[in-house]
From Swiss-Prot:
Record bears the keyword Lipoprotein: no
Keywords: Carbohydrate metabolism, Cytoplasm, Hydrolase, Magnesium, Metal-binding
Taxonomic path: Bacteria, Pseudomonadati, Pseudomonadota, Gammaproteobacteria, Chromatiales
Family: Belongs to the FBPase class 1 family.
Pfam families: FBPase, FBPase_C
UniProt source species: Nitrosococcus oceani (strain ATCC 19707 / BCRC 17464 / JCM 30415 / NCIMB 11848 / C-107)
Protein name (record): Fructose-1,6-bisphosphatase class 1
Gene: fbp
Description of how the protein assembles with itself and partners: Homotetramer.
Binding site for substrate: 117-120, 209
Name of the top EC class for this enzyme: hydrolase
Length: 335
């Protein structure tokens, strides 16, 4: 018998603390949780039911899709379009926004999601996950357009991710701290196991793809060189490097023990401002990290203050332990 609250109970208790709450937000979160449970089940059984491997298609980003990318996207859409809580959706896998079919009622929220982050790892049994961001639909809008989604990250109502690893974990923030829930497979419920998650201000761990070092801008080169010099250098401590190529895994590690994650601009394609998507990855993860006491930046700007220009806009991402990210920001200011 669990003494900690189920996620459903936790959400309802939060709702009761807000006198004006109607239950729509609670209902939406519960629907997202249900979709993530379904994806978790398929990820766990992928090799047994022949849903691993390439789908033979590309997404809007021009990236080859895995079978589970397509299946996970369909699960999110099919689980949420009929509920009456959403005005529209947007997916990293789809070019335009996803309207709510006419036969279903429309709600007051907009949902953006990456249905299976890190899916390049799925065939080699490394953790993947689902990332989502909830925005309010403008009050006077009955048929949302893409422009209605172009809100800065500071306007997010809620952000979360579900990581499908040795255990399935759901991490959530609604702007009042960060909480983590573990899926009990026996009863099919998420249990609060990591209340009030906080990122340590200091760290001795960085995550970056070192194979791209020659393409980085000078401030990032300088920061990483400082770390690599260890105790003998200006940092006076030894650092460890991590790189999983799965943002949900990287951010979850930072939430539990600190660290800095960097996916900076590089000169391989200098006209691209970055690699990660602002609306589906950078904004929700930045909201979570900041609510846990961390910092998130492009190096030059707070990510949550970026005014989006498109739903598939890309940005550089530097996030994690406060003192490390602020050091990288300072190096950019000095450059």
């Amino acid at each position: 018998m669990h003494s900690n609250p189920f996620l459903t109970q936790f959400i309802l208790e939060e709702q009761r603390s807000i006198p004006s709450a109607t239950g729509d937000f609670t209902g939406l979160l519960n629907d997202i949780v249900t979709a993530c449970k379904t994806i978790s089940h398929l990820v766990n059984r992928g090799g047994l039911i022949d849903i691993l491997g390439a789908a033979g298609t590309e997404n809007i980003q021009g990236e080859g899709q895995k079978k589970l990318d397509v299946i996970s996207n369909d699960i999110m859409v099919n689980s949420l379009e009929w509920t009456g809580h959403l005005g529209a959706m947007a997916s990293e896998e789809i070019e335009g926004i996803i309207p709510i079919p006419g036969q279903y009622p429309k709600g007051k929220y907009l949902l953006l999601f990456d249905p299976l982050d890190g899916s390049s790892n799925i065939d080699i049994n490394i953790s993947v996950g689902t990332i989502f961001s909830i925005l309010r639909c403008p009050d006077d809008v009955s048929e949302p357009t893409q422009e209605d989604f172009l809100q800065p990250g500071t306007q997010q109502v809620c952000a979360g991710f579900c990581v499908y690893g040795p255990t399935t974990m759901m991490v959530l923030t609604a702007g009042h701290g960060v909480n983590g829930f573990t899926l009990d497979q026996d009863i099919g419920e998420f249990i609060l196991t990591h209340p009030n998650m906080t990122i340590p201000e200091d760290t001795m761990e960085f995550a970056i793809n070192m194979s791209n070092q020659r393409f980085w801008a000078a401030p990032v080169q300088r920061y990483i060189e400082d770390c690599l010099q260890g105790k003998e250098g200006c940092r006076n401590k030894n650092f460890n490097m991590r790189w999983v190529a799965s943002m949900v895994s990287e951010v979850y590690r930072i939430l539990t023990r600190g660290g800095i994650f960097m996916y900076p601009w590089d000169s391989r394609d200098p006209d691209k401002p970055g690699r990660l998507r602002l609306m589906y990855e950078a904004n929700p993860m930045s909201f979570i990290v900041e609510q846990a006491g961390g910092v998130s930046s492009t190096g030059d700007q707070r990510i949550l203050e970026i005014n989006p220009e498109g739903i598939h806009q890309r940005v550089p991402v530097i996030l994690g332990s406060k003192n490390e990210v602020e050091r990288v920001i300072a190096y950019h200011q000095e450059a």
